[in-house]
């Protein structure tokens, strides 16, 4: 809070109570319920008044003295200081006459006493009736807050690292044109006193607040038109004054009497650089450098000419304008001669001589112009475009500079060629669909064959038909030509039709789905063919194209299947053949024992009944899943194994009125009825 008078201090960091304390210590009346931004504005005004407190209104007071014709010339400066030291109300300043509102001397160059109690008036901020966020104090447009403050001495507010010596001193009155003032004797004496007691020159911290001093008729031009040589980086609102350089020439002496020429050139260059930094050029880098040198030379020339009487009155802008006009005239003459040489040389591709030329003493190796792209230049100054391009002449072609004329693509012809191309593709697609899917394609083929005797030959196509293989039936170009000719619009001429047809053929030859030569054309694409026909044709073509591969796959698959089935059947037969054949033998023995005990049954079992008992009638092989072929193979193996037993006889016998093959056990039967009964009730080993 102690360093709030520092211009770099941010007042927003202070609390409201701190702001009120500052206002109270400064003797400023303030509203109690105002917003923080209002307190910040009031404190900011106090800080600005303290920073800018200086001899601001000396000239206004002097002019008031002149207008009132008072004779108070002997009054001291301390007595009149409170009257002009601080600004008055803005509403009153607007009513001053013209001679008071526009002083000849800037009030910022006047001294101010350090310790003087003066009233400081703070203007109310700009308000708007439409702003609903402003307080009551902002809505009163004519409210002015008056406060009385005591300006501390220079050393009181100076930081420790700064010098206590004040830099604000009176401005030398030699910088002002006193001849322009129609003053009283007292006013003239006061000006002489101020000019004789001050020998300092101003240094501005900011170029924006510098004031133009009017030139005196008796003073040297170097004193009032000389720009400041030191501009600090930090921009402030106040003005500081530093002593003049000891090498600066006096008013009565010549500019070159006390200063060396080398030092003066260096000083002039610094002044010129300072002016250029304030007004930066926006031209190209090369042109900027050239203009930089020209303007510096002009600046130095004008400075040297001011030493001669009569010449110093010439304005520098006039010489710059004259120099630029002369430079433009020289450039125009040079361009005119260059244009004439270029037209004489012509185009480089037309056989024109490429010898060197000289313009205003400048030698050029060759001035011939390059022929524009897509153009033919038969003569030095004549341009002819290639087919498919038209000549375009821009607005600057009358000037004769390149590129004056060039060839552009003919958009209307390109559109017509694209229309012909799409129509040719549509016709070829319809013919391709008829050829592949329709049953009435014989008429189209007959028409196509009729053009073989007198074929249409495309001369603009440089395609050899020796190495071209057509994927399908090709069509004659004459058939396509006549088909499009039948569809031609009546407004299209025959010559234009022939030109567009040949151009469309050249475009079609670059299409991937079209294969053609100078006489035949073939469309190799499925576009325009129905889906069902397309799938059928694609499948047939695929099978026919890969028939060898597909046949090999089928044969190999069959062999593999047979081998797998063979080994599987063999494993099943090897697993169940012993138990099944033993079951058949045991069944024959039981049948023989039952026959011997009861004499009521036949001692034989038919093979058909044995097969059913074995595979279906709760036999040992009923729960085994196998194919019919495997079951048949297993039964054949069982029959062969049982017939190899010597005690089993196979014969033909009548069973239930039908003759069939039967098996009979003829060997010794060791089974009796009890064992047979127990055998029947016992679960077969094949079921386990």
Swiss-Prot record:
Modified residues (Phosphoserine): 684
One Gene Ontology term of the molecular function aspect: centromere-nuclear envelope anchor activity
The keyword Transmembrane helix is assigned to this record: yes
Bias kind Low complexity: ranges: 82-92
Pfam family for this entry, one: MSC
Observed effect of gene inactivation: Modest growth deficit. Suppresses slow growth rates of spores and severe nuclear envelope (NE) morphology defects of vps4 mutants.
Phosphothreonine: modified positions: 683
Region (Disordered): 62-113, 202-227
GO cellular component: CENP-A containing chromatin; chromosome, centromeric core domain; chromosome, subtelomeric region; mitotic nuclear bridge midzone membrane domain; mitotic spindle pole body; nuclear envelope; nuclear inner membrane; nuclear membrane
UniProt entry keywords in alphabetical sequence: Meiosis, Membrane, Nucleus, Phosphoprotein, Transmembrane, Transmembrane helix
Topology term for the membrane: Multi-pass membrane protein
Comp. bias regions, Polar residues: 212-222
InterPro entries in UniProt: HeH/LEM_domain, Heh2/Src1, Man1/Src1-like_C, MAN1_winged_helix_dom
Tagged with keyword Translocase: no
One GO BP annotation of this record: heterochromatin organization
Residues passing through the membrane, by range: 318-338, 547-567
Function: Nucleus inner membrane protein involved in meiosis. Plays a role in regulating nuclear envelope (NE) morphology and nuclear integrity, particularly during spindle pole body (SPB) extrusion or insertion through the NE, and perhaps during karyokinesis.
Name the record gives this protein: Lap-Emerin-Man domain protein 2
Organism: Schizosaccharomyces pombe (strain 972 / ATCC 24843)
């Amino acid at each position: 809070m102690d360093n709030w008078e520092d211009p770099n201090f941010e007042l927003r960091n202070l609390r409201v109570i701190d702001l009120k304390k500052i206002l109270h210590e400064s003797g400023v009346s303030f509203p109690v319920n105002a917003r923080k931004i209002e307190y910040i504005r009031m404190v900011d005004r106090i800080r600005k008044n303290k920073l800018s407190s200086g001899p601001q209104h000396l000239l206004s007071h002097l002019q008031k003295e002149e207008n009132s014709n008072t004779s108070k010339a002997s009054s001291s400066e301390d007595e009149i200081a409170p009257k002009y030291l601080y600004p008055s109300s803005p509403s009153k300043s607007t009513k001053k006459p013209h001679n008071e509102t526009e002083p000849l001397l800037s009030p910022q160059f006047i001294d101010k006493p350090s310790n003087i109690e003066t009233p400081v008036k703070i203007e109310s901020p700009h308000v708007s009736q439409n702003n609903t966020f402003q307080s009551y104090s902002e809505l009163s447009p004519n409210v002015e807050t008056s406060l009385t403050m005591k300006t501390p001495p220079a050393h009181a507010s100076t930081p420790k690292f700064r010098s206590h010596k004040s830099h604000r001193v009176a401005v030398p009155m030699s910088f002002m044109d006193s001849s322009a003032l129609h003053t009283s004797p007292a006013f003239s004496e006061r000006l002489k006193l101020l000019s004789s007691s001050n020998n300092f020159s101003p240094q501005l911290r900011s170029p924006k607040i510098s004031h133009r001093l009017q030139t005196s008729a008796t003073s040297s031009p170097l004193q009032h038109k000389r720009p400041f040589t030191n501009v600090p980086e930090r921009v402030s609102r106040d003005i500081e004054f530093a002593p003049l350089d000891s090498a600066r020439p006096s008013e009565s002496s010549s500019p070159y009497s006390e200063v060396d020429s080398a030092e003066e050139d260096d000083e002039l260059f610094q002044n010129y650089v300072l002016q250029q930094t304030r007004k930066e050029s926006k031209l190209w880098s090369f042109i900027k450098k050239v203009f930089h040198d020209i303007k510096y030379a002009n600046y130095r020339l004008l400075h040297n000419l001011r030493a001669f009487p009569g010449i110093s009155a010439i304005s520098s802008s006039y010489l710059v304008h004259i120099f630029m006009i002369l430079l433009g005239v020289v450039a125009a003459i040079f361009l005119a001669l260059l244009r004439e040489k270029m037209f004489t040389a012509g185009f480089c591709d037309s056989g024109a001589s490429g010898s060197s030329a000289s313009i205003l003493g400048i030698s050029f190796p060759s001035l011939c112009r390059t022929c524009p792209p897509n153009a033919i230049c038969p003569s030095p100054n004549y341009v002819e475009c290639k087919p498919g391009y038209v000549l375009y002449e821009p607005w600057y072609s009358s000037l004769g500079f390149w590129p004056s004329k060039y060839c552009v693509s003919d958009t209307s012809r390109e559109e017509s060629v694209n229309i012909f191309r799409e129509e040719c593709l549509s016709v070829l697609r319809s013919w391709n669909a008829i050829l592949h899917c329709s049953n009435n394609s014989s008429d189209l083929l007959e028409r196509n064959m009729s053009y073989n005797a007198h074929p249409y030959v495309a001369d603009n196509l440089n395609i050899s038909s020796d190495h071209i293989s057509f994927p399908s039936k090709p069509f004659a170009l004459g058939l396509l030509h006549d088909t499009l000719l039948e569809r031609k619009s009546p407004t299209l001429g025959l010559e234009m039709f022939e030109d567009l047809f040949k151009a469309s053929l050249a475009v079609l030859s670059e299409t991937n789905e079209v294969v053609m030569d100078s006489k035949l054309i073939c469309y190799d694409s499925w576009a325009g063919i129905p889906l069902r026909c397309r799938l059928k044709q694609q499948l047939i073509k695929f099978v026919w194209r890969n028939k060898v591969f597909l046949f090999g796959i089928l044969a190999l698959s069959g062999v593999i299947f047979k081998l797998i089935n063979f080994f599987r059947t063999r494993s099943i037969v090897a697993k169940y053949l012993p138990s099944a054949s033993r079951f058949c033998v045991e069944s024959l023995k039981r049948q023989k024992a039952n026959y011997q005990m009861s004499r009521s049954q036949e001692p034989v079992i038919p093979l058909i009944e044995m097969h059913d008992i074995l595979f279906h009638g709760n036999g040992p092989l009923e729960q085994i899943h196998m194919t019919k072929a495997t079951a048949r193979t297993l039964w054949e193996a069982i029959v062969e194994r049982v017939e190899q037993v010597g005690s089993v006889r196979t014969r033909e016998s009548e069973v239930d009125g039908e003759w069939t093959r039967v098996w009979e056990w003829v060997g010794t039967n060791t089974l009796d009825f009890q064992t047979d009964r127990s055998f029947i009730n016992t679960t077969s080993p094949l079921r386990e």
